[in-house]
């Protein structure tokens, strides 16, 4: 079930974010992601509209919207490939007429996932925090 984020979810969300970030972005030092946990908790999650996918009273994944930007979508690594991400992305699409996102170019599985979900590439940019190239993608904007 997908529901709105509650403050009690924060520890599970941060655990998922950190473990999934390290797994998906092995080309960035794990220490970088660990250094961003407090910023996620104190800045990014509160500033966004966040929803969680709950299964058996546990958070299995979450996504965050900031305006029409899909600012985050993360699934617990042990549940990836089981439809959680697709369900969350479908939910996000139902809440916005269009969505934009950025994804690291080295993150081929996520790029393929977004393309399968109907996103198209608009161009490229460099993430100032990591120096890695990203694709800018959109869905029906």
Regions found by a protein language model. Give the residues of each.
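A short beta-loop-alpha structural element at the N-terminal edge
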Residues: 1-15
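Conserved GNAT acetyl-CoA-binding A-motif
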Residues: 94-106
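A short, internal acetyl-CoA/4′-phosphopantetheine-binding micro-motif in the GNAT/acyltransferase core
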Residues: 69-80, 103-104
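Conserved acetyl-CoA-binding loop-helix of GNAT-fold acetyltransferases
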Residues: 81-94, 112-116
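Conserved beta-hairpin
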Residues: 49-61
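A short helix-loop-beta-strand connector motif used in the catalytic cores of GNAT acetyltransferases and
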Residues: 41-52, 69
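Conserved GNAT-fold acetyl-CoA-binding loop/helix
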Residues: 14-40
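Conserved catalytic-core motifs of GNAT/GCN5-like acyltransferases
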Residues: 102-104, 120-136
């Amino acid at each position: 079930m997908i529901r709105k984020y509650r403050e009690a979810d924060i520890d599970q969300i941060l655990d998922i974010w950190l473990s999934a970030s390290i797994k998906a972005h092995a080309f960035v030092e794990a220490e970088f992601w660990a250094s961003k946990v407090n910023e996620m908790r104190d800045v990014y999650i509160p500033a966004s509209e966040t929803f969680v996918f709950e299964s058996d009273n546990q958070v299995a994944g979450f996504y965050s919207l900031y305006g029409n930007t899909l600012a985050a979508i993360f699934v617990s690594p042990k549940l990836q490939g089981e439809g959680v991400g697709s369900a969350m992305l479908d939910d996000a699409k139902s809440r916005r007429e269009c969505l934009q996102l950025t994804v690291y170019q080295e993150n081929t599985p996520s790029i393929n996932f977004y393309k399968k979900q109907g996103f198209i590439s608009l161009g490229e940019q460099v993430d100032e925090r990591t120096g890695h190239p990203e694709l800018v993608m959109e869905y029906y904007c």
